[in-house]
From Swiss-Prot:
It holds the Pfam family OTCace_N. It is found in: Cytoplasm. HAMAP family: PTCase. PANTHER family: ORNITHINE CARBAMOYLTRANSFERASE, MITOCHONDRIAL, ORNITHINE TRANSCARBAMYLASE, MITOCHONDRIAL. It comes from Enterococcus faecalis (strain ATCC 700802 / V583). This is Putrescine carbamoyltransferase. Transmembrane segments: none annotated. Putrescine binds at residues 268-271. Homotrimer.
Amino acid sequence: MKRDYVTTETYTKEEMHYLVDLSLKIKEAIKNGYYPQLLKNKSLGMIFQQSSTRTRVSFETAMEQLGGHGEYLAPGQIQLGGHETIEDTSRVLSRLVDILMARVERHHSIVDLANCATIPVINGMSDYNHPTQELGDLCTMVEHLPEGKKLEDCKVVFVGDATQVCFSLGLITTKMGMNFVHFGPEGFQLNEEHQAKLAKNCEVSGGSFLVTDDASSVEGADFLYTDVWYGLYEAELSEEERMKVFYPKYQVNQEMMDRAGANCKFMHCLPATRGEEVTDEVIDGKNSICFDEAENRLTSIRGLLVYLMNDYEAKNPYDLIKQAEAKKELEVFLDTQSI
């Protein structure tokens, strides 16, 4: 039975801990010059309905470093649900590659793709969530845990618009038993459906969440996180209107960092619009870990690919006798036939 990674809602806290541990172990090995060929001869199909920098490069590099290959399918090269149905696309690609990743415009597309594919499917981002970012962020927070604290002791504050990254950060922090705050303006906060899912996580993990427009909510934060201000509302608000909503109250500047605390770390999924949601002083400052965070997109994707492929193959083991027979038959054919 194959396993997909469409949302962390289908993963346990323990599984996420394991994914972090695996990812960081592989990272350590590669830093020391050992590239474990855990995906040798494996191929990844990458479907992009939207352009990407970090996601595409991370998946391609991960496959290369671990002995496999990534095939990039650019916007316009493949049409999910266009001329060919999603069902047919997933069935065909399931026979051509070993694992699929898709960055889609609508979440139902990745759900349909995963339901129809016979191989593991990874959500590279949708309009609902960004689960690969979640895993990378979790790896980053584990690496930068405040001295003497466990994950469950940490407070994570997301500042600004309720983007899919904001929701995903809420999902992963509440799943891990952390304390999550969304500090954003009314009308741009996590909605009731989002909050219900965070509450469900908290019931299991013992974590907490708060949605507020109170600026004092950043106080005592271990991690302060922001994203661009134009994510979900680009077509609805002009730049001038966005600035009126978010600036200056929701800009992460040095004053906000100081209010959070001297040891608070700054995070951003990138790309950042410097001068809007964050100042140069903060993003380039000593407490900024957003570039470690960007590196950990690769770190976490390596671990995720290995986990999904190993789990899949463990449940679908190759028949070694048939494999040996096929090898022998091919060798005999090549020895006895000529063109």
